[in-house]
Amino acid sequence: SGDTTIIFKIYNFLKEKGVNVDICGANEEANYDDYDIVHLFDIKNIFDAYKHFKLASNSKCNIVVSPMYFNMEKFFQYSDNVERNNLWNNCKAYRELILKKSKIIFCNSIYEKSLITKDFITKGEIKVVYNGVDINYDEVPLYNFKERYNLDNYILCVGRICDIKNQLELSKVCNELGIDLVLIGTTSEESYLKECLSYSTTHYLGFMNDYDLYNAYTFSNAHVLASFSEVTSLSSLKAAAYGCNIVVTEEGASKEYFKDMAIYCDPYNHNSIKSAVEKSKVKRKNNKLKEYIRYNYNLKNMLEGIYEGYLKLMN
């Protein structure tokens, strides 16, 4: 997932800087007194972060957090899921406690910063550090992705397969338009994936490594993510950096990142998604968005921004 990718990129960057750094998984514990900084990630799914927060807050370390926050209330109400909506609201106090106790809150957009200050009371510095992606395969030969998977023109969607990412609606749209949809990513919602695959034009290729994704992006008509919840999508950034046309959700910080260079859709509106996919089929690829993303949202900028925050805290 996106947060795991970011965690490992930060870990490797700090190792190269000679910093002693460890990753502590959801079900692991550490002696937090051994650390100057504990960096927590993702307060949407609060339980893992809160467990580490409780233990770390009793030690002498500095706590910082990357909230990866998006208010899910609208989606839970739309999907008529009272139980999930109640749980979301009941956990607000735990999210706020983490944010209040954090010395730095790393937001990945001005949008997320404004959402945090609107929904919570905070005390520490809020520092905007935009997400970034690395480009690894520009000089590496492609293989013919269409040939390997027996595809013609196709729409690509990379990300966890689940109701929040809205691949089912995208499957319906692509089926109506008679265009192949390729889904790549892990899933913990098998029944949801099965519904997507009930449409003959939807193809699921499972998890893929970066090199295979590079080929998938390069040969696709467009990358589409009509998600209900997206502060910003690493897969959309990566797709854009490899030269894809992209269709992205209106929700979240999409317009802050992609300006007028993406095609936008309303995830709550079938016809909006359909219209956006149709536009992406005929839009010619150009390098404007590709170069813009590579310059402004590269991995180096993101890692340096987080490292600067750490250094400021230590000094």
Model-predicted segments: where are they?
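A charged, aromatic-enriched C-terminal amphipathic alpha-helix characteristic of glycosyltransferases
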Residues: G2, V282-M314
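Short, structured helix-loop element that forms part of the nucleotide-activated donor/catalytic region
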Residues: T4, D180-L205, D212
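Membrane-proximal helix-turn-helix segments that form the acceptor-binding/catalytic region
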Residues: N71, N85-I105
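Carbohydrate-associated surface elements
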Residues: Y111, G132
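Conserved donor-binding/catalytic core segment of Leloir-type glycosyltransferases
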Residues: K146-K165, S171-E176, V182
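Aromatic "clamp/platform" in nucleotide-sugar-dependent glycosyltransferases that forms part
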Residues: F228
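Short hydrophobic beta-strand element within catalytic cores of glycosyltransferases
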Residues: N245-V248
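Conserved acidic donor-binding segment of nucleotide-sugar-dependent glycosyltransferases
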Residues: A262-H270, V277-K283
